[in-house]
């Protein structure tokens, strides 16, 4: 499995199609702020088959209280360090392959800080994600992300905060 950084309009259109077709509980491909996306390919097939996409973007503001507590920051300190946090804004797989989910997250943890620094000039120290209500975050737990709390959630469901950090 390989991650390919999304750069071209054709790749951006592919991300849009994957999200709209395979991510039904939040089917929008739009986001606000910074954003870096990758397409996920099976490197064991020729030609390589696209297995999904994953993306990070600007973190959330205001921050959830559990996140502030976990990282030991005030809201003001978080604001000062905002560009060191990224939100795993979307993760869509189009196929079910054993262990693929945690393999993708491992690659994301490797590539995200490099690309974040390259594109934005900031050191990425924290990746955060929100797991939709009714889901248990098993793929994140398999990659050793920690559940740090629950948010009030979107109007239709609660979500759990999970994070991975480089410390």
Can you say where each PLM-predicted feature lies in the sequence?
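Glycine-rich acetyl-CoA-binding "A-motif" of GNAT/NAT acetyltransferases
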Residues: 47-51
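Acyl-donor binding region in acyl/amide transferases
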Residues: 43, 53-166
